[in-house]
């Protein structure tokens, strides 16, 4: 499979390594800071203004986007305009806003059979296989404890000092999955409210080079239930992104990591 990378920071480099180890080809890299790239035989990385229009980018089966919050939507739209599906892992931007308004940006680039559907997109706040299992278990546990009653949830997330957004997109996803089950009633449009995750408080900690720790705590008067995921490195996130790209190839429309893993509950 031919892969384009959008963003060539630590995650981009890890994704490159995993993709190559699985037999894929990196045909294009787009980054705001062009530097020599070993996987392209010494060629320089494209800047966004030239990269998306390049023959190299258009030859990709899928693009994997890990950039910055302010650039993510623009990058996705530019990729789709060239008919290239996108796996996006950038957090801290208005994903739902894009999802609600997304249309084929350039119908001439799409095959006739997909003229009314944009090229495939997967966005996830976390591509780790383990975290996506955590999402599924968290959602199910919230439903069980809603029936039991008497439990109060809270979330703690810990990341390295370089992470730009807080709380993490993963923590927000966990809170989003808890809130409807635990707090929403018929006729009540409960929504996330800023950084506290609606009715679910989130504590964000930034320290050292921690790849990522997420803990969901349910406390009652008599006991405590805890769900916890701790990443050992970025490799798990990179592998999940490549698995998502393999699954997305040839598909149209908006998809989720839960679909990739068959975890829809």
Q: What kind of feature is each model-predicted range?
A:
Residues 2, 10-57, 149-265:
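C-terminal substrate-binding/catalytic lobe of Rossmann-fold NAD(P)-dependent oxidoreductases
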Residues 53-62, 66-89, 95:
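Rossmann-fold NAD(P) dinucleotide-binding segment
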Residues 73-77, 89-106, 115-123, 132-143:
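Rossmann-fold NAD(P)-binding glycine/threonine-rich loop
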Residues 27, 46, 87, 120-122:
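Structural detector of well-ordered beta-strand residues that form the stable sheet scaffold
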């Amino acid at each position: 499979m031919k892969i384009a990378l959008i963003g060539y920071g630590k995650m981009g480099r890890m994704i490159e390594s995993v993709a190559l180890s699985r037999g894929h080809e990196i045909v294009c890299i787009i980054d705001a800071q062009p530097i020599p790239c070993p996987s392209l035989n010494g060629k320089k990385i494209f800047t966004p203004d030239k990269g998306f229009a390049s023959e190299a980018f258009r030859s990709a089966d899928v693009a994997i986007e890990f950039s910055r919050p302010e650039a993510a939507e623009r990058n996705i739209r530019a990729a789709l305009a060239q008919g290239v599906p996108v796996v996006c892992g950038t957090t801290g931007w208005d994903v739902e806003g894009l999802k609600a308004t997304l249309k084929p940006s350039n119908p001439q680039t799409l095959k006739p059979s997909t003229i009314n559907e944009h090229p495939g997109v997967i966005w996830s706040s976390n591509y780790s296989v383990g975290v996506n299992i955590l999402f599924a278990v968290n959602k199910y546990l919230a439903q069980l404890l809603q029936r039991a009653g008497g439990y109060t949830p809270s979330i703690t997330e810990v990341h390295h000092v370089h992470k730009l957004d807080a709380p993490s997109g993963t923590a927000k996803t966990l809170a989003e999955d808890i809130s409807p089950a635990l707090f929403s009633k018929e006729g009540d449009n409960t929504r996330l409210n800023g950084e506290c995750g609606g009715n679910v408080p989130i504590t964000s900690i930034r320290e050292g080079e921690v790849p990522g720790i997420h803990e969901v705590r349910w406390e009652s008067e008599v006991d405590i239930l805890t769900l916890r995921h701790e990443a050992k490195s970025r490799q798990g996130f990179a592998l999940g992104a490549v698995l998502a790209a393999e699954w997305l190839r040839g598909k149209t429309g908006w998809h989720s990591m839960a679909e990739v893993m068959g975890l829809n509950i």
